[in-house]
């Protein structure tokens, strides 16, 4: 299996794409079942100098993040991420690890609304984060009706390290429509909003919209998206691909 997300044709100032570009829905492994997703991206044209001492500039760095998860109960799933990167002219490096616990409330999986929560804790290298210990609390909301699927994640990101700064707010949205059996087309929007207590103007911070294809192929779940940055702080063009399976 392989996953690849390429930031392509980018021009101007860019930031490193996240290790996981995904809107959480009600996907959940059955109790005792494992799953594996692979996420990857590369900024083709971006910053070439660090924004803080020790940061690895993102240009031409390939990021690959395997995500292994396991169903604990019908409503709980435990996941583990390993963050890796391949800088130009260097060997693969480990950027840290994260663990998550996802809860999805019982619901009709075929139609109607659903909700859940996701808590993530991690330690990352100085190359990708100025503070090593970080946490994210994610709300999961969604709805299925006819051929349509809607999803929304409101995220609170906080540093657990000393002097980590204010809690940051972001919003991820998804709307997809089934166009054939096992095939959906849609849009995903990823918006960083700034500090929770005083969000920034909408014209600030990275915001990117993706045209996406969701496809089941031979037991694999594929999410392919082409993204367009909407602000000067976002990558201009991003191509993302996530490949997942259960076993």
Task: Please provide the spans of the model-predicted regions.
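Cleavable N-terminal export/targeting peptides
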Residues: 1-20
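Transmembrane beta-barrel domains of Gram-negative outer membranes and organellar outer membranes
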Residues: 14-244
């Amino acid at each position: 299996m392989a996953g690849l997300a390429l930031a392509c044709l980018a021009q101007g100032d860019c930031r490193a794409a996240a290790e996981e570009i995904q809107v959480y829905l009600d996907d959940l492994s059955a109790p005792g079942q494992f799953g594996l997703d692979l996420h990857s991206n590369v900024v083709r044209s971006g910053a070439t100098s660090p924004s803080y001492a020790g940061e690895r500039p993102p240009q031409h760095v390939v990021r690959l993040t395997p995500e292994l998860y396991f169903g604990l109960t019908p409503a709980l799933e435990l996941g583990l991420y390993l963050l890796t990167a391949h800088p130009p002219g260097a060997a693969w490096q480990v950027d840290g690890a994260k663990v998550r616990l996802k809860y999805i409330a019982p619901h009709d999986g075929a139609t109607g609304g659903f909700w859940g929560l996701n808590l993530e804790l991690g330690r990352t290298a100085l190359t990708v984060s100025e503070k090593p210990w970080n946490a994210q609390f994610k709300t999961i909301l969604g709805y299925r009706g006819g051929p349509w699927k809607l999803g929304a994640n409101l995220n609170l990101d906080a540093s657990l390290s000393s002097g980590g700064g204010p809690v940051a707010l972001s919003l991820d949205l998804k709307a997809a429509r089934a166009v054939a059996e096992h095939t959906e087309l849609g849009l995903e929007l990823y918006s960083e909003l700034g500090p929770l207590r005083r969000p920034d103007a909408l014209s600030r911070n990275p915001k990117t919209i993706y045209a996406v294809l969701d496809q089941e192929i031979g037991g694999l779940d594929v999410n392919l998206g082409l993204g367009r940055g909407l602000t000067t702080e976002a990558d201009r063009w991003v191509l993302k691909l996530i490949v997942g399976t259960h076993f």
